[in-house]
């Protein structure tokens, strides 16, 4: 066709635009087999499948980052038709015009005529992002001239590379080819002179080259197409470039001088010969166009390519050719090419010297133009890094050799920027240029086959572009940028320009992942680059090459190093230290890079957060080929990534995924599992903390670095960071043994590094959440320790995930401080992992894996270490100093030494933690260290006893394993700490989750820990091994536990004393109470030392202000359930508790799993439960034990603190029970734990908890008021199987969580309430035992127990429950006979201690005594919990008629708790006995004078006052909605409620408490007959048990008015939770009307509002529901009563007046309602009047004055219409015609308003403005 060039170009532009629209964003080719995603983006089916297959985690749409799945992909036939039609059109166009429009990426195939067109018009190669294509295309179409002018300017700024083609030398052309690379997306277009756009952030002016061979042109075109398709393909294209090289050489030979210089600064326009040449030039220009930025991008891409060694190799040859050409080496081609390259690179004026190929010119012009060019190149590279184009680096390398000839610095920059690319290219270039020789040395060997290249071209590059590239390329880009920047720093102008351009042009969001890599790169490459920059070009190249080599497997050096990856890594990290220039340059560069990273990289990282989605492409980088690893390493900068790569090379454990290599360095399986998680974690963490991302990558470099990295942003001095990084790297080197053992430290071995990396990754979030500031505190001094610790600890943590590694890492972690420092971070990291796992939808699989792997690893490891180290850990944790003197301190001696290191490090870490909130513990020194250890250890897998474990871990990394072991073995001892033990096992996990979720909360917790540690100082030191951490983690809970576990605590103390008298002594000073208990416990048994420790620590916390600090936290924090949960869930959970409500939050989060963290916690709980199961199995737990374990697991699954508390008791008890069976001491400890737990639970409300246990066990049928007693029963392990108890507790906790969340988010609240109430319903459901059992079964399912429990197990549990129910019936009968007979136990704490002391005996009596556990639960809780003890005293347990033996059995109750597992019948009997005893106790307690309660209270007031109320309020509430209701009463209205809640620290009388407890017991389905007996007893003892308030609360019947459906749902959940009745209509039974009000409690008037006032109901604001949910207790309605309405006034107090009034409002009035009325039916109005005492007349004739009543006719004149029959006014006049508003207003204020104002005669019809709003509501 004879078309004008304009028309052709327009058509071509249109075709290109269509191609862009129809191209696959992944492969940048026309979509083949298009498939659409849910986000309506279309991709090639193959591309998407490859993407999906390569992603371990949830894949994300490359464009919008929405998650995609294979299922969501749908074929798009119409789109395929469009593509086919477009191809046909393009084919026709090409046939007609002779121009190639292939895919819109190839330069036009114009023949000479087209080339003439090119000559005539400037070719604008404008790369337009996917989003900007249309605009750019339109702009291109608008006119090439304008673009040409503007582009020329831009190019001058950016630096334009112009190439000359020899073939077209004769054709000087003024025409310029502008390549505008401005797209954010990886997609770019190369607009031929026709307007093909090449995507790049840089505009490059290309002079069309002379005409070349058609083949060359075609190849150039193809290359151009490829290039446009993907700059990554540029490398491949470079192959075509090779073909083009001669052409380019010829072009170079051509005279560029003919071409006017368009570039203002560095823009060089070389006249190009033919159009064909123009296209080839465009290609060549592409190469040239790829400036430093592009080189950087290419570098990254090249790294990707290096991964694809084949492609890299082929590229090498091409690059070599192009480089030779660029360098103007002896090769003519090189010369020709070099000249244009140099010209373009240098932005030379050599246009005039088109044939002057000498590098001299480049040298002359290199400096400024090259810098400018570099900046533009960097810009392009950045863009390419987004696009993952390697061609840029190739071209840049090509130019670079020229520039290298020109300037070593330039070469250095290009080399560093290009890194691997230049290396490979330079390898070829080595021959042509000695300067390049170094680079050649560094150059990688690219052995990747062409097929790989093709794959890379099609997908690898594309994917790498988006996945690896955003990850690697961006990192490379950033690194290159940094590298370039350092180089730029050398070349000052270039630096600034590069920064600006990069920050502006690049959109980091596309490279979110790269942020992480950037960090690593920053560190490693900064080191490398620093070295490079500091060193000569060659040296820099070699070093850079080393880094690059490490990154790129292709590099010879890297291969050498890869051969010895650990050594090379050590050398690499070490080389940073070794290389003087490197270390110096590292600090400098690091500062620089830190600045840059903090600036542009931060932005990029921030943006990249979203771009992290790019990760989906990462799978390519995951290619097992070492080059891929190398590429990743390139991104992460040789040092860390190299190390990783080397490590991965050494350790082939699934390091294929180099980007995730670090993570992969962890156990291969875990690495693979964790990698996606880690990436997710990185993503989430990076998203939250861009710097954190860096740290994650930096963590790859060095876990120390990563901790530091997060600090890096925090670090005031990047220099320091660099130094620290170096130190960290060096530290791992120094700790090579440690590192090697630990997994090779960071540089030492990739095991450490991977673990570090994963640790770092999680660590970064931790630092970000928790210790970022702290880390910065640690930076200078601690960073090393932190590094070492982080490496080691990270290793340990990894080890926890990977037991083998953990053992090695733990043992090898040179310093406990490192471990324990790092464990903190590590746990945080783990939290991040968990969170990210949640984010990545890996939760299910990950959790399962965690169950199977992580759980067992940490569990097995810890269990192994725990038993031997239990004492040591206890002692060591108890006091680091004690470790030295203590014989057990042997391991502790090591621990001590390490802890000495730890302490120094911990000092730093503590400083960090101090920042986090552990300043005092940190300051405390060793105790602080212990505390720190505890905190950190909480973070660590064996976090529960981290303090000790830290000591142990500090002692040796195996210490962690030992700690794991220790946990297992300790669990019997820990049973007292009970939850602690499980916590230890599962706690590590859970803590991690909680800690993650709690990141900031950790600070609070840490603060609490600090305080508690300070208060507990000695106690913590003494009991720190077991309880310090618990105290830490459970700070508040610990205190609660101390109170609760007071009795067991004594036992624990005695065990502790026996085990380590020093510890007991130390703990004794902590608290007198503690000492007393300790002494008692000493008397009782040394076996309970773990419990004692927990109790000690906890008690000191309670008695100390520390607990008050905890108490400052929400009440739930103090809840027994929560406290125990925190204890059981682990210190991590406690941390969460401090920030949130430890237990309750965890419970809520766990149960509701509202947040990833919560979910993680829940998952962790599941894992923990699972572990516990395993543990119980390990403990030779019988099926019964398994059942409790399952129940415990269920409770854990429910993630309920109550579960943890009771369940923990049960589980630990059960496992320990099995162990206890094996070992009486263990069982006694288990009993102690149970007692402690129950005591803790009961402390806050013995009966409530016991009732709750039994209630939940029997169907959790404790109702509102009785809920707490029922809960007490439910919590009685004997009464209720742990699963039920836990379920119920979990449900209650969940309910509280839901309540809490309800408050925070109504929807969430509704969901939470629903969830909680559903679960609670299952557990709390009605008093029918059967329903209880059913609910329990349901709960097990609801609690995700179904995953853990088999159907058979569930059936067995159900059967056991049924048996228990039957036995309870028997118990009921017994209670009826003996219910009123008190057992006469001493009411005082001494009785409890005695009971505790008797516990050992109870062990013997367990089977029998266990039966009495319910009763003992009440007793034990009393004794265990000072507050409860006081209550119990007032109640007195002893008077309960429970003999001391019974009491002991109560103490032993845990064993019955075990026994239910072993023998549900015995448990049932025990329960029945307990119920009987409890009932008796309740009766006697009720009968006990309040004086006893008061007298006892003072003793426990300190502990009780702080914890009890919170616990009582919080725990009772969390434990049950009933308890919540009752707790509201104790707080505001009813002491009996306090009794129920057992919160009555001071106010609630013992009788009331006992009554409440009794009521709870009665209600508890656990005792069907027992309930009856209890009820009878209660009624006999004191009808006050069901006091009017209590009964009123229980009898609350609500209606809602004016609420939205969501709010109604929340109220429903609220009612279900608190066992409140909720009806749709107001009835006589209705007590409360819930109505929406404003802050002043002013409401809209509704029908129910009027009816409620008329009926004397409570008109309560909806805020009451919300506040009660928030407070997790049923608040008094007094404060929420409506004060007014919008019509009659805001404070008329009508509702209150109506309730208090003894007279009817309208008494003596005879009223007739004359219809019509609006908004209110007549019958409702009449009902309203009747409620107010009026005599309603149905018919007007009946209205007479003779009756003596005042006749009134109510009318609504406003409702009269012409259509309606107006009433006969004459007849109406029989009475006073009054507006109905009079009734409404009078009722509102509950005062008769003046009738005169409402007489119809006196007012207009408009008067009825006050009709009720939504009166029908």
UniProtKB/Swiss-Prot annotation:
Biased composition (Polar residues): 308-319, 640-652, 959-976, 1405-1426, 1473-1485
Signal sequence coordinates: none
Zinc finger (RING-type): 24-65
Coiled coil is among the record's keywords: no
UniProtKB keywords: Acetylation, Activator, Cell cycle, Chromosome, Cytoplasm, DNA damage, DNA recombination, DNA repair, DNA-binding, Fatty acid biosynthesis, Fatty acid metabolism, Isopeptide bond, Lipid biosynthesis, Lipid metabolism, Metal-binding, Nucleus, Phosphoprotein, Repeat, Transcription, Transcription regulation, Transferase, Tumor suppressor, Ubl conjugation, Ubl conjugation pathway, Zinc, Zinc-finger
Class in the EC hierarchy, top level: transferase
Boundaries of every BRCT domain copy: 1588-1682, 1701-1800
Biased amino acid composition, Low complexity: 744-760
CDD domains: BRCT_BRCA1_rpt1, BRCT_BRCA1_rpt2, RING-HC_BRCA1
Modification sites for Phosphoserine: 114, 393, 686, 706, 717, 975, 1153, 1155, 1181, 1242, 1298, 1304, 1344, 1380, 1414, 1482
Cellular component terms per the entry's GO annotation: BRCA1-A complex; BRCA1-B complex; BRCA1-BARD1 complex; BRCA1-C complex; chromosome; condensed chromosome; condensed nuclear chromosome; cytoplasm
Keyword flag Signal: no
Main location: nucleus
Reactions catalysed: S-ubiquitinyl-[E2 ubiquitin-conjugating enzyme]-L-cysteine + [acceptor protein]-L-lysine = [E2 ubiquitin-conjugating enzyme]-L-cysteine + N(6)-ubiquitinyl-[acceptor protein]-L-lysine
Biased composition (Acidic residues): 1176-1185
One record GO biological process: negative regulation of DNA-templated transcription
Disulfide bond annotation, renumbered to this chain: none
N-acetylmethionine PTM sites in chain numbering: 1
Phosphothreonine, modified sites: 1351
Protein's pathway: Protein modification; protein ubiquitination
Comp. bias intervals (Basic and acidic residues): 320-340, 669-679, 891-901
Comment block on domains: The BRCT domains recognize and bind phosphorylated pSXXF motif on proteins. The interaction with the phosphorylated pSXXF motif of ABRAXAS1, recruits BRCA1 at DNA damage sites.
The protein's name: Breast cancer type 1 susceptibility protein homolog
